[in-house]
From Swiss-Prot:
InterPro entries: ARID/SWI1_ChromRemod, ARID_dom, ARID_dom_sf, ARM-type_fold. GO terms for molecular function: transcription cis-regulatory region binding. Keywords: Activator, Chromatin regulator, DNA-binding, Nucleus, Phosphoprotein, Transcription, Transcription regulation. Component of the SWI/SNF complex, an ATP-dependent chromatin remodeling complex, required for the positive and negative regulation of gene expression of a large number of genes. It changes chromatin structure by altering DNA-histone contacts within a nucleosome, leading eventually to a change in nucleosome position, thus facilitating or repressing binding of gene-specific transcription factors. The lineage of its organism: Eukaryota, Fungi, Dikarya, Ascomycota, Taphrinomycotina. GO terms for cellular component: chromatin; nucleus; SWI/SNF complex. This is SWI/SNF chromatin-remodeling complex subunit sol1. Residues 17-30, 328-353 have a biased composition (Polar residues). The modification Phosphoserine is found at S852, S855. It comes from the Eukaryota. Belongs to the SWI1 family.
């Protein structure tokens, strides 16, 4: 082998360094003293721009050193050296010119003595040995580099480093990181290509990069920043999904202040580059589509694809260094094959098609060729190549990452009516709302109603009714006018005639469910023809009156929840007459006042809540008003209409109706309203007494309503009593007052013997509440428990009710069907936790029974505990 391809290491200037695998040398440092090989064949080392990277070496020819050729400068070498220029003269000395020139090595003289030829042969043999040793060292270094893990700053966006990475030293445009021992030469070459392309692009654009961006005196790795952003789908996707904090943390800047600076630097330095690359990608796709259409007719013959010219645009950089090139081509070009299977390429591959990943390992640049329409460089192919376009199924979510759960809740959130809040209203003019209510214009009234509904519906804010009392007057006027319009077409009926026809709450609820199930939309053409008649105009007025009346009482209901507003409503002289008038209208025309069963049910509930909140301030003026109020309250009783034709029967039902809070939610407010009316004034009691004297059937219906909430005696009754404590207090208070209205012994006996025995069941419940250890602890541990029994008032009212019923039964000489056994009474008397006052009351009850033997004879096995 001759010496044509070798040049001694001493002939090269020391100002230029050629780092090996795993090493990096600056331009002014000392380089290793081994001979350099300039060759383009595989198995050698090519010297390019500041480093000597190992090319793709064939494993079958590791020692193929004889087929080397002299070094030829690549055109990409001049392109990749924007700020440096070298000139090697023929003798290897520094020339200092402004261009890059590599002259051929010196040829030996043709006339060499025999001694010199011998020395040259020995020197050539030594050089071959050194070259083989160098090749082995480089292979070992290459394997060591491949076994290393990728640095943390090269992972994807979704990866979070467990330990915060220390910012690297300031990189230059030629080195991506200050610590070169952690980066492969392929990464350094990729960084160089990226920075050269970026600087060239910004200079051509007219916005040159004058300074390198830094955050907290730490330079930003622009290539890594660009790769992370493009891997996430581009800057738009990063901003849309708020990936900037993750990208900043991946680059070593986790502070919140660095995020805004990072976004600013990206928009200034890399955003134009990204837009140009995307535009080039679109142009490339259109060209490929045109080629595919052109080659559709000649797919049986091999195609000759012209070679792309080398450019400095972002398109050329990504086409040469991208790792996600066309993966569907059967015979890729040699350049792409080298990039894809190079061992020095990064190991992280982006899964997104449109996001450019990290630049791959550097490859041997090819000389530029001019592409013409008449001539093209042929590609050797053993089989015909058919264009296969990249296919992707259509995303029904348009790119949004929606899973099944999010899609399921998406329809529910869209279909649900979003009510505005007080914040959405801004400044509200109450005087303008009052004028709108008094204008008699339907649109103005509707707008004012909607605003007032929003203002009064907020539970965190109380509408100050005392500061704007004109609103109450305006609402009363609107409700009065609407009620007049609805009653103008309805006949008047007698109260006693409609008492048996008055539907209960359960019947109204059933009618509402039937109406909803049978709902059907009317024909549009028929609606247009009906709107031309006079009756249709009246129907529209009636519909508007119904909606306005419902809105007014919803507003009154919301206002009545606050005590300050209750006083303002009661002090208005027109409010109570309006309420009584609506109650009478619902009693007379329960099913015909409003056309819709749902509106009828809503109006019943709103009027009951208003009456429940304000009844402690009402004084019933006469018996007629008291009768209407009582009939309206009794309509919410849990009494089962299937077992009786009318609500006022001659005989009581066989059992007390069962109360369930889920199915009878408005029985409690009805009892509360009746209790407040009884406790307000003696005049109310007098009016109720007159009603019960004239018609005892009302008294039986009221007893069924009050007795339904008293739980039956069983093992769960104590827990039920704890949950219903406020309702039980009101119910027992009303029972004690209602029993005082009873004057007939037969009626009292019927109440005591109804079902399995209401008298016995109540007495057992009172015994349980009085003697339970958790409610009345022993005296030695009394300090650990509350001193007052929470059921004390219930027990007192219950004993008063039992005493009154027992006295009425004794007056009529009527025997009870059941009575507690003597063993039960003895157990209560001997219990250490039984309350003393309750024992005295029990003793008095037993003494009043007269003959104890008679009481024992009335006991049976059914009533035993």
């Amino acid at each position: 082998m001759n010496n044509q391809g070798f040049v001694p290491a001493s002939d090269y200037p020391t100002a230029v360094s050629y780092p090996t695998q795993g090493q990096s040398y600056n331009t002014q440092e000392e380089q290793p003293a081994y001979p350099q090989r300039f060759s383009t064949s595989q198995g050698m080392y090519a010297a390019e721009y500041g480093n000597a990277n190992m090319m793709n070496t064939s494993e079958n020819e590791p020692n193929n050193l004889a087929h080397s050729q002299p070094f030829r400068q690549s055109p990409s070498t001049q392109r990749n050296l924007p700020n440096q220029s070298f000139d090697f003269a023929s003798n290897g000395a520094w020339n200092g010119s402004g261009s890059v020139k590599y002259s051929s090595p010196m040829m030996p003289s043709s006339r060499i003595p025999f001694q010199q030829e011998k020395e040259a042969a020995m020197q050539q043999q030594q050089q071959q040995q050194q070259q083989q040793q160098l090749y082995q060292r480089q292979m070992q270094s290459r394997e060591a580099l491949l076994s290393q893990q990728i640095p943390p700053n090269q992972i994807g966006i979704n990866a979070h480093p467990a330990v915060r990475q220390t910012p690297q030293p300031a990189p230059s445009p030629n080195t991506p990181s200050g610590n070169a021992n952690q980066l492969t030469p392929a990464y350094a070459a990729s960084f160089d290509k990226f920075m050269v392309s970026l600087i060239s692009f910004m200079e051509k654009r007219g916005t040159p990069i004058k300074s390198y961006p830094q955050i907290n005196n730490t330079p930003i790795n622009l290539m890594m920043l660009y790769a992370l952003v493009m891997r996430a789908g581009g800057s738009r996707q990063v901003s849309a999904h708020n990936f900037w904090p993750k990208i900043s943390a991946s680059l070593g800047f986790p502070s919140p202040d660095a995020i805004s600076l990072l976004i600013q630097y990206y928009n200034s330095y890399l955003l134009p580059y990204e837009e140009a690359w995307l535009a080039a990608q679109q142009q490339q796709k259109s060209l490929q589509q045109a080629k595919a259409n052109h080659s559709a007719n000649v797919q049986s013959r091999p195609k000759n694809y012209p070679q792309k010219p080398v450019q400095t645009t972002p398109e050329a950089v990504h086409a040469n260094g991208s790792m996600h090139g066309s993966l569907h081509s059967k015979s890729p070009s040699p350049a792409f094959t080298a990039n894809r299977f190079s061992p020095a390429a990064p190991t992280t591959v982006s899964s997104e098609r449109n996001a450019p990943p990290y630049p791959s390992a550097p490859t041997r640049p090819t000389p530029p060729t001019v592409q013409t329409s008449s001539s093209a460089a042929p590609v050797d192919s053993a089989e015909p190549v058919a264009y296969q376009p990249i296919k992707k199924p259509i995303d029904p979510m348009l790119g949004y990452p929606l899973n099944v759960a999010a899609t399921y809740r998406l329809d529910e959130s869209l279909l649900r009516l979003q009510m505005p809040s007080i914040v959405d209203l801004g400044t509200v003019n109450i005087q303008a709302l009052c004028m709108s209510l008094q204008s008699t214009l339907e649109k103005e009234i509707t707008y004012a109603m909607n605003v007032l509904l929003i203002l009064t519906n907020d539970q965190k804010w109380m509408f100050p009714l005392s500061e704007c009392q004109d609103v109450v007057d305006a609402l009363i006027d609107v409700a009065t006018q609407c009620l007049d319009n609805l009653l103008s077409v309805l006949p008047n009926e007698d109260l006693m005639e409609i008492a048996d026809k008055r539907p209960s709450y359960r019947q109204l609820l059933y009618n509402c469910c039937v109406e909803i199930s049978q709902f059907s939309r009317e024909d549009f053409s028929n609606s247009l023809s009906e709107n031309k008649t006079k009756d249709s105009i009246n129907a529209i007025d009636v519909h508007n009156s119904e909606q306005n009346l419902l809105a007014v009482f919803v507003i009154f209901r919301n206002l009545s929840h606050f005590e300050a507003n209750q006083n303002v409503l009661v002090q208005n002289p027109d409010f109570f007459p309006l309420l009584i008038r609506v109650v009478k209208s619902l009693n007379f025309h329960a099913t015909s006042l409003l056309r819709s069963s749902r509106n009828t049910l809503d109006l019943h509930k709103d009027v009951l809540i208003v009456l429940c909140q304000l009844s402690q301030n009402f004084i019933l003026p006469n018996v007629d008003v008291a009768r209407h109020v009582l009939l309206f309250i009794l309509s919410f009783s849990p009494f089962n209409r299937k077992k009786s034709k009318t609500i006022l029967n001659d005989t009581l039902p066989t059992s007390i109706p069962s109360y369930t809070p889920a199915t009878h939610p408005y029985a409690g407010p009805a009892i509360n309203a009746y209790a407040k009316l009884l406790a307000k004034d003696a005049n109310n009691k007098t009016n109720f007494q007159a009603i019960f004297d004239n018609n005892p059937k009302f008294l039986d219906s009221l007893f069924l309503l009050l007795a339904s909430v008293v739980p039956k005696f069983n093992r769960h009754c104590l827990k039920i009593c704890e949950r219903r404590l406020p309702l039980l207090q009101q119910s027992f208070f009303c029972l004690a007052a209602t029993v005082s209205y009873v004057k007939q012994s037969e009626q009292a006996a019927n109440w005591c013997n109804i079902g399995e025995g209401f008298f016995v069941s109540m007495l057992r419940l009172l015994i349980l509440l009085s003697g339970h250890p958790s409610l009345n602890p022993p005296s030695r541990v009394a300090s650990q428990y509350p001193t007052t029994n929470p059921f004390r008032y219930v027990i007192q009212s219950g004993i008063s009710t039992v005493r009154r019923l027992l006295s009425l039964v004794e007056a009529g000489n009527i025997s009870l069907s059941s009575f507690p056994k003597s063993e039960t009474l003895l157990a209560v008397l001997l219990a250490p936790t039984t309350e003393t006052s309750f024992l005295k009351e029990i003793s008095n009850l037993l003494d009043r029974t007269g003959d104890s033997d008679a009481s024992l004879e009335n006991t049976d096995d059914k009533s035993g505990i």
